[in-house]
Regions:
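Class I S-adenosyl-L-methionine-dependent methyltransferase catalytic core
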Residues: 1-167
């Protein structure tokens, strides 16, 4: 179904250990954010601002509560909209150093989002994109979009794919 899957704590830990050195004074876009755990973790590890995009009202409420609990509201913007409308709204207004997305598996949504990002003005030049996807997800199209897969971290049932903009 389309329900949100929590990214497990271990996965989250691994993810942030892999990018920890870079989380400085930067901006983080959390797409299909679910509970907001990833974006909130990013803020707590030094990101200047995180933008959360989520369409599900229950998930939005969860993000708001988690931000309140962690007292990180000042560094967060929550957009309740589908990802593509949100990207259009942000395009030209904001640039991101990190984009994390955890789309529903097996709907090819990551490809649609990456295709949009490739022609948008949303990415800083050394931006890192991280996609959480099922192990079967095909990423062979990345190079045509001008992206480079730098790393794949496989877990039991899913993986994190680290993508950069080609120089």
């Amino acid at each position: 179904g389309m329900e949100t899957r929590p990214t497990t704590d271990r996965t989250k830990e691994t993810l942030f250990n892999m990018i920890a050195h870079g989380l400085c004074d930067c901006t983080f876009l959390d797409l299909f954010s679910g509970s907001g755990a990833i974006g909130i973790e990013a803020i707590s590890r030094g990101v200047k601002k995180a933008v959360f995009v989520e369409n599900n009202p229950n998930a939005i409420q969860c993000i708001m509560e988690n931000l309140k609990k962690t007292q990180l509201e000042d560094q967060a913007e929550v957009i309740r909209e589908d990802v593509f409308s949100a990207l259009r709204r942000l395009d030209g207004r904001e640039k991101f150093d990190y984009v994390f997305m955890d789309p529903p598996y097996n709907h090819m949504l990551e490809k649609e989002v990456l295709t949009y990002l490739a022609k948008s003005d949303l990415l800083e030049k050394d931006a890192l994109i991280i996609v959480e996807a099922s192990l079967a997800t095909d990423f062979s199209y990345l190079e045509e979009l001008g992206f480079l897969m730098i790393k794949q971290k496989k877990y039991k049932t899913n993986m994190h794919v680290f993508i950069s903009v080609e120089e």
